[in-house]
Amino acid sequence: DGLDRLGKALQRFIKEDPTFRVSTDDETGETVIAGMGELHLDIYVERIRREFKVDVTVGAPKVSYREAPTRLASYDYKHKKQTGGSGQYAHIVGSLEPMPEDVEENFIFEDKVVGGRVPREYIPSVEKGFRFSMEKGPIAGFPIVGVKTVLSDGSYHDVDSSDMAFQICARSCFRETFLQTKPVLLEPIMKVEVEVPADFQGPVTGELNKRRGLIVSTETENEV
């Protein structure tokens, strides 16, 4: 069966190459493969066809952008829902801001709640809701990176508050607040070192500039 062979192929590639990733588009059901570039993925597609005898249909490659905040935004968000039975209530206050440049992590959650304004058992649910929201940004649906969130205050209801209520609250709050941080799209860049004969320096430089490459430095050594 073609699907079984495709699954085996993808599992083998994942084991062989940590930069090769596989996911499924929830809306279309398509299998999405990601890697270091178009050539990298072309090699794996050819292996699927040649080694595993699976005639796959491949769409046009897409650049894997990221979404990131550029300024601090404060939030004071209340989730309140009342139905026939018990309702839902959660209230969180805090801020969302860009990650400091010297920090390499993509997400930091700081709990600054004092006095039990948000019970300790609900705080992990707030963090979980924020983390879930990082998977798909509101600008173009790309993952979000470089976010520091702070939870400083809030409130709860003795009956209607729950882990789920605080998680839902955090998800909705994150999406709304992130849009206030003037978010931007980031595109992937790669650092490369190019060695060419001195006679070709001009054409190669022109080609890099045409592709929006940023040349940091040039050196000439032994006519190279």
What are these regions (language model features)?
Residues D1-V224:
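Accessory interaction regions appended to the cores of large information-processing enzymes
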